[in-house]
């Protein structure tokens, strides 16, 4: 297996060389605009027609489903039409803190030991095995700044993001500011439950343009359009004389799901096909889930060992709905939650639209690499699970779009090769013409896929959550989840993209399971923990 991986790396180096040659032969340094979105599962835009997409269940009518996707994410679709979409992209860890720390430092969670949100600790302060492993890591903007790039950000890029120090200032950023705004008073929905908050923000006439995320995007768009913008005495300033790395962090659709009425009205609950059959399907999906994984879902077992409702946020929401209305209150609560999540996705999309408008109106569009990612996925009831914090695709698969102005042939293309957010760091450095600053950075340069989305790619995606011994490995066809107690899940992702049928231990996949296990061993060894 190591021989196959080495062959891939050698073979792809030729394509990388071609890509780098096109990027650096007499060209001015590339600008980077990075857009980060919190808790956005691949649900709208180009993903809506994937057979495993959650919208397929909520809106089984294709015409209506297309309309809903267009209401939800028209601007993200616009970016997809301009660049390449990675259809099988994964986070390094399905939680904000480890995912973002890994992406920004290039160091994998099973290597740093940061595999959970860890109480919100600042990533540089996190200690694993007696070592602050990320304390002196060079982040992507930090390294670019060292080599002459102007770096600036607003919004959530790192997990701790609303104050100066925990946004990694002044190491990562030349300039940083927290732009805040509100559409008005928040009115909770009667259907919200413990641990889950949603409702309407502002009065009925309030516009999404007043919301916090949109104002952040407007600020950054103004920087691009006019060359500068100021907030609270901090001025961002860009010019053609210096390459820049601008990062916009969009908080929605992270909880709480508060949205303005103009966006909530786009997703009437009457259009949703939420049924007890769907609920029962997700409950029964737990019949072959390893015991350890029950910690991550709303599943429990009765005395016979059959799956029943447990105590996840999702099942708590269902019970709260029944306390309001014993006649389908659980389904009504579910639909109401989805309405507010979808509207929150639309907030993120409108912010994306504003920053894309700003770039298109600026003099930098032809020389700016645009990267949009979500830090992880988000379960909305699958396996009776809600939020992230699991190694199933609902929580682990992400949005990942790249618009490379120097590879216009990739516009509208899709790549089904498995990739990871950990690959962004080496890709940006490759396109910037810089060597990697740290041997602990073990992601892969994605530029061959910019040139040819179907290029040979034998590197799997790998994720870790909860402990360095809980890992997922994903090829284009298969997936293995290995838990710290020895439990595992194996899925045929071509035949079973929703991960209903756990094949672990079955004779039909003995060889495949062994191959996946070997791939996982290689991935772990490649980025194993060391205090050196």
Regions found by a protein language model. Name each.
Residues 23-30, 37, 42, 85, ...:
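Long, internal low-complexity/basic segments
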Residues 28, 64-73, 90-94, 129-137, ...:
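A short beta-strand-to-alpha-helix junction
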Residues 32-40, 156, 245-248, 398-401, ...:
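A short aromatic-rich beta-strand->coil structural motif
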Residues 41-138, 143-149, 163:
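Active-site segment of extracytoplasmic enzymes that catalyze sulfate/phosphate-ester chemistry
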Residues 48-54, 357-413, 420:
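Histidine-centered active-site microenvironments of extracellular/periplasmic hydrolases
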Residues 114-152, 157-264, 268, 319-332:
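Formylglycine-dependent
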Residues 214-232, 325-368, 523:
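A long, amphipathic alpha-helix that forms part
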Residues 219, 229-230, 376-382, 410, ...:
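C-terminal cap/loop subdomain of S1 sulfatases and analogous C-terminal strand-loop tails that border
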């Amino acid at each position: 297996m190591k021989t196959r991986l080495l062959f891939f790396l050698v073979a792809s180096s030729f394509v990388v060389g071609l890509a780098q040659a096109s990027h650096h032969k007499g060209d001015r340094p590339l600008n980077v605009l990075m857009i980060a979105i919190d808790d956005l599962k691949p649900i709208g835009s180009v993903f809506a027609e994937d057979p495993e997409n959650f919208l397929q269940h909520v809106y089984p009518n294709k015409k209506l489903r297309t309309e809903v996707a267009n209401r939800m994410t028209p601007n993200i679709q616009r970016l997809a039409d301009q660049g390449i979409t990675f259809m099988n992209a994964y986070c390094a860890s399905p939680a904000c803190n480890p995912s973002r720390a890994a992406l920004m430092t290039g160091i994998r969670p099973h290597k740093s030991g940061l595999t959970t949100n860890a109480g919100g600790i600042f990533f540089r302060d996190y200690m694993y095995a007696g070592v602050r492993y990320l304390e002196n890591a060079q982040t992507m903007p930090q390294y670019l700044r060292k080599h002459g790039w102007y770096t600036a950000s607003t919004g959530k890029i790192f997990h701790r993001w609303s104050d100066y120090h925990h946004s990694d200032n002044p190491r990562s950023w030349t300039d940083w500011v927290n732009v805040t705004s509100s559409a008005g008073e928040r009115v909770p929905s009667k259907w919200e439950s413990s641990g889950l908050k949603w409702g309407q923000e502002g009065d009925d006439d309030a516009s999404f343009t007043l919301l916090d995320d949109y104002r952040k995007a407007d600020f950054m768009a103004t920087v691009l359009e006019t060359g500068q913008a100021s907030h609270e005495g901090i001025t961002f300033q860009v010019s053609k004389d210096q390459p820049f790395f601008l990062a916009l962090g969009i908080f929605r659709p992270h909880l709480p799901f508060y949205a303005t009425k103009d966006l909530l009205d786009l997703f009437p609950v009457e259009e949703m096909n939420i049924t007890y059959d769907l609920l029962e399907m997700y409950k029964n999906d737990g019949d072959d889930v390893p015991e350890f994984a029950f910690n991550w879902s709303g599943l429990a077992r009765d005395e016979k060992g059959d799956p029943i409702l447990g105590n996840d946020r999702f099942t708590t929401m269902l019970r709260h709905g029944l306390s309001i209305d014993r006649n389908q209150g659980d389904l009504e609560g579910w639909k109401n939650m989805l309405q507010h999540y979808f509207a929150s996705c639309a907030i993120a999309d409108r912010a994306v639209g504003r920053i894309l408008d700003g770039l298109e109106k600026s003099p930098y569009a032809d020389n700016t690499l645009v990267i949009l990612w979500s830090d992880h996925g988000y379960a909305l009831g699958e396996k009776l699970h809600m939020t992230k914090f699991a190694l199933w695709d609902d929580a682990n698969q992400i949005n990942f779009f790249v618009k490379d102005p120097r590879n216009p042939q990739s516009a509208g293309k899709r790549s089904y090769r498995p990739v990871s957010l950990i690959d962004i760091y080496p890709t940006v450095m490759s396109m910037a013409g810089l060597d990697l600053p740290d041997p602990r950075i073990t992601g892969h340069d994605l530029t061959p896929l910019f040139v040819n989305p179907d290029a040979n790619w034998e590197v799997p995606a790998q994720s870790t959550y909860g402990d360095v011994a809980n890992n997922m490995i994903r090829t284009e066809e298969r997936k293995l989840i290995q838990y710290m107690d020895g439990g595992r899940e194996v899925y045929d992702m071509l035949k079973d993209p929703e991960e209903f049928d756990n094949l672990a231990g079955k004779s039909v996949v003995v060889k495949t399971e062994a191959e996946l296990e070997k791939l996982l061993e290689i991935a772990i060894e490649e980025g194993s923990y060391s205090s050196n």
